[in-house]
Amino acid sequence: MLPTRMLADPPLSLYVHLPWCVHKCPYCDFNSHAIKGGLPEAEYAAALLRDLQQDLPRVRGRHLQSVFLGGGTPSLFRPETIALILDEARQCLPLIDGAEITLEANPGTIERGRFAEYRAAGVTRLSIGVQSFNTLHLQILGRIHSAQEAINAAEEAHAAGLDNFNLDLMYGLPQQTLEQALMDIRSAIALAPAHLSHYQLTLEPNTLFHAHPPALPDDEVTWQMQLACQAVLCKQGFNQYEISAYARNGRQCGHNLNYWRYGDYLGIGAGAHSKLSDLQQGRILRLWKVKQPSAYLRTAGTAQGIGAITDVAEADRIFEFMLNRLRLYEGFSPADFELATCLPYARIHTALEQAQALNLVQKTRGRWQPTPTGYAYLNDLQARFLPEVSTPATPRLRPTVRA
């Protein structure tokens, strides 16, 4: 463990989970629940505020650099409720100047003028879940919106003065061709987003797609989709700063950057996770709230509302740091590792040199980052830092699944 005098609190973000959606998509493994009978909006907002008050002693005196309202479908909540949540957060935890406040939105839930109302409530950034502009693929993915509604949502964001918005897109979809994947990218670029997230569809456990797998494009086709879309985005002025994230004009997602840099985050809401550093003790804590919304509504703000609290073991800190930081194109320095993990750089130096000998990582101006080969086999590179796992002599020839 490093001396505490050498350490400073990592940046802190707030995640607010709003778990309800109109319809559970067959690929979604998030803690989301289709609305049955009505949205308990006021009751849930009150539970969130109790939850936040309970967690304050863990982060008192710190400032928030970002807030992210995720789900579920946060755009189901009225702007007045979003304003209430954000106002309470500001009173409890000061926000830094220019703090990023993101709200996730489903194009199928947006009425005219709604984004302007969210902006008035304090939202500074939107993340719009488009996934595809192809009618067949939207149906296969179980999305409730049409391609035109996705276009309308982006235009509404511009009209509201929320030009800093992200579009989520997926590729490697059932029955998708390379040209269709490129059409999705071109359609997204035409809407002038500041940010674009481009994820490969994966079949996650506890989803309908996992139980009844659809036929997906083969690995070679999916790889070509990724490379071709990547080339189009870069040509159009999008800078790839993370495996699946692209930004124009420096408008990276500050909230996700804090995750990927192994910063701290406080999570409130059903199933929300937190990662918090206790530098005086040289500890990193993880805690999460009960998952079921009905149980959360009953127990938020009490000891019963916390599902578990655990200490992150030193070996797990190493893996978690590398799992996240290796996704970023900015690389990391030895000091970045020490400040984020409270551990000496010597704990990873040998493993990095071994990976360097295999052309998986490189060191440039004092910063480590994957090589092109390392990014292509990122899962294998990350696995070299798993606790108590003997590392393979050479990488396995399997492209990384980008998600």
Predicted regions and their residues:
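Local cysteine-cluster metal-coordination motifs and their immediate loop/turn environment
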Residues: P19-S32
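A short, conserved structural fragment
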Residues: Q356-G366
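Short, amphipathic alpha-helical interaction segments positioned at domain boundaries
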Residues: Y375-A403
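Non-catalytic, well-ordered alpha-helical scaffold segments
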Residues: D168, D316-L323, H349, P372-Y375, ...
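Short amphipathic alpha-helical interaction segments
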Residues: C342-Q354
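Short active-site neighborhood of thiol/selenol oxidoreductases, capturing the structured segment around
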Residues: L14-L18
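Minor-groove-contacting beta-hairpin "wing" of winged helix-turn-helix DNA-binding domains
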Residues: R367-T371
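C-terminal scaffold of the Radical SAM
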Residues: T4-S13, S32-R58, R62-L343, T394-A403
